[in-house]
């Protein structure tokens, strides 16, 4: 089969329902098509011993495309490992309809055949790049496909923050924390904090306070090209945590500063040509149909 994709990575959630049958069907199709297959170590037990396996770093270096079988979390985990190498992803959904994994197991082979033949919609989504600064020096950094969260780390105490956008003061707040979200993350934690849903390819960032003390402190959408700077206000009982997609920065101090901006490169998701984000929203959120 003529294709720009010659080496296909297979990544799956080993304990997901229907995972074995779905991966077996995809594996058989790829073998018949004469394509190279590289199976991620975590699901290697679901394949014949002769299958070629590799770690995520090896997949990132060698694969032309990754087929991810599972849910949104499985795809996001793969994206974090692969996006720096420019490996596009295709999501096969097991279980409930996902925002990111949109191909059903019953259609997996047909849809995958079309995508590998070039009949697809490519979608670029930018993560966030965050760094923790102390005395002007970077002491920790990370990336977030969904969100960067600054919070007190305690269910019983609030945190006091000052936020600036491109060096211009935005506001100060007392709250349980602040979510800085990508469009991808706008349907995740930020949504539960009252944030808006952003179209996935929109060049924008959401700032959503978590349970603000001042009720007029509402979520705000800013340019995706803006630099968000967060500082802590003096507090005798200071404690804070900063996390990128639930991966925490260590030892956050009261004089530290957090800088968050759009990452330099996107990750790519390949969808079937009939992909419809609004249909997914209607289904997931139980919106009315016509």
Curated annotation (Swiss-Prot):
The lineage of its organism: Bacteria, Pseudomonadati, Pseudomonadota, Gammaproteobacteria, Methylococcales. Belongs to the NAD kinase family. GO terms for biological process: NAD metabolic process; NADP biosynthetic process. It catalyses: NAD(+) + ATP = ADP + NADP(+) + H(+). The keyword S-adenosyl-L-methionine does not apply. Coiled coil: none annotated. One of its GO terms (molecular function) is NAD binding. The active site is at 72 (proton acceptor). Its cofactor is a divalent metal cation. This is NAD kinase. InterPro entries: ATP-NAD_kinase_N, ATP-NAD_kinase_PpnK-typ_C, NAD/diacylglycerol_kinase_sf, NADK. Involved in the regulation of the intracellular balance of NAD and NADP, and is a key enzyme in the biosynthesis of NADP. Catalyzes specifically the phosphorylation on 2'-hydroxyl of the adenosine moiety of NAD to yield NADP. Keywords: ATP-binding, Cytoplasm, Kinase, NAD, NADP, Nucleotide-binding, Transferase. NAD(+) binds at residues 72-73, 146-147, 174, 176, 187-192. Its EC number is 2.7.1.23.
């Amino acid at each position: 089969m003529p294709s720009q994709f010659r080496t296909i990575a297979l990544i799956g959630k080993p304990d997901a329902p229907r995972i074995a049958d779905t991966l077996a069907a995809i594996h058989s199709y790829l073998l018949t098509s004469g394509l190279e297959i590289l199976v991620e170590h975590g699901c290697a037990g679901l394949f014949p011993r002769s299958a070629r396996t590799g770690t995520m770093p090896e997949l990132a270096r060698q694969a032309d495309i990754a087929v991810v079988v599972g849910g949104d979390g499985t795809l996001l985990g793969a994206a974090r490992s692969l996006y720096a190498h420019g490996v596009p992803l295709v999501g096969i959904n097991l279980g409930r309809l996902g925002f990111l994994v949109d191909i059903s197991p019953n259609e997996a082979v047909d849809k995958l055949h079309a995508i590998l033949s070039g009949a697809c919609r490519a979608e670029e989504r930018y993560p966030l790049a965050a760094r923790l600064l102390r005395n002007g020096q970077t002491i920790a950094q990370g990336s977030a496909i969904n969100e960067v969260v600054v919070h007190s780390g305690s269910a019983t105490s609030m945190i006091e923050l000052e936020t600036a956008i491109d060096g211009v003061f935005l506001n100060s707040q007392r709250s349980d924390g602040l979510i800085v979200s990508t469009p991808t993350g706008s349907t995740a934690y930020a949504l539960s904090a009252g944030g808006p849903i952003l179209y996935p390819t929109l060049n924008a960032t959401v700032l959503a306070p978590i349970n603000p003390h001042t009720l007029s402190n509402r979520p705000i959408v800013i340019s995706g090209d803006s630099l968000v700077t967060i500082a802590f206000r003096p507090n005798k009982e200071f404690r804070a945590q900063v996390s990128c997609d639930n991966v925490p920065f260590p030892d956050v101090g009261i004089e530290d500063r957090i800088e968050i901006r759009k990452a330099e490169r996107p990750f790519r998701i390949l969808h079937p040509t009939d992909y419809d984000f609004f249909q997914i929203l209607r289904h997931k959120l139980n919106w009315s149909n016509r």
